[in-house]
Amino acid sequence: MPSSPPPSRPGPSARLIELDGLRGLAAAVVVIHHCLLTVPTFARVGAWPGVVPADPAARILTQTPLHLLWAGHEAVLIFFVLSGTALVYPVARRHAQGRRFDWVDYAPRRIVRLWLPAAASTALAVTLMVLVPRSADALLGPWMTQAHPAGLSARHLLLELALQPRYAYRNTVLWSLHAEAVFSFLLPLVVLVVALAARTRAWWLPAAACLAVPAVTGDTRTLVYVPVFVLGATAGWRWGHLDAIAPERPAPWATPAALACLVLVTIGWWPGLQGPVAGRLAAAVSLAAVAALVVLAVRAGALRALLRSRAVQYLGALSFSLYLVHEPVIVAIRLLTASWSPWLVAPLAVAVTAPLTWLFHRYVEAPSHRLSRRAGRWVSSRVRRAAR
């Protein structure tokens, strides 16, 4: 009787292209979010539940699932789950193949990958501040005046370049890169936790613990969003040990389930769900919906035609550059058109941001990515030589 073949190991790491599609769509939502914040009515609503606009149309866009169209903070939660998955997935693939992950290569690579584009986006924001001075005119709304004060203190600029969140006001999106940096430094510890959980066949336990955090605190910002990243890390470790990750054909129920998750992402904004108990439950449900959306897209093929479409994939490829350049442009356009209707900001912002995003990707992000790989290889080779 022939012996059974040895269990196969996962092959080379395949890119999870659904993640790119989700990242691109999330970046587009953030752009819409910031465009709407130039409208004083929506600026008073802000990024977190609590303020109910008096205008009926604004209330519909705020307190119904239509809020998904400009759910900026929830879109960033998707970014964080995707980052956790993307960073842990290659580590898991190497582990499944019996190969070591080069942490010495990872550290400088990650530093260059994050900090160079962030520094370039800060330089862009400062340049636009000099060319288009910021204003304290209350008619512009609280987002334009309070989140974008004037001033170019060298001390604050240095702190901002270090990705300290309190000083990232020249380009407000940099607060999220502070969270990315924190998680990047904690990645070895996170990998250890999810790996130990998986070894005891309780791979789901870190995810369950992370979902419990907003249920207790009522806030997904707890611990610099590390629990949100860990949700993605748990999925990345699990998927990295599978032979087949994405199904050949989408499950028939996958897209309806994903659409239900998209609706639930906005649950924290629905009427009557801002109280102490209801708010905690809504925060947990919203985060669970974000995580489930990512799982459904990858493992069940939800929204596959959309996420794999050429336009959405292209948007995903440029999403980091779009994220880093759009906000200073929107602020500058609103200042230049202060006497115009703020509703004109969106089309003007798209017209200016689209080519600027391409240029930033071509001359900043892509070279930074290549440099990060060279830096990682160089440091790793030097450390190996010194260890001999």
Regions found by a protein language model. Name each.
Residues 1-18, 32-72, 89-98, 190-198, ...:
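Alpha-helical transmembrane segments in multi-pass integral membrane proteins
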Residues 19-22, 71-83, 90-134, 144-148, ...:
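Transmembrane alpha-helical segments and their boundary/interface "anchor" motifs
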Residues 24, 35, 181, 185-188, ...:
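Catalytic glutamate of the conserved HExxH
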Residues 49-65, 104-108, 114-181, 185, ...:
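Membrane-interface helix-loop-helix regions
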Residues 183-191, 205-214, 260-262, 330:
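Hydrophobic, membrane-inserted alpha-helices
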Residues 324, 381-388:
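Cytosolic juxtamembrane regulatory segments of multi-pass membrane proteins
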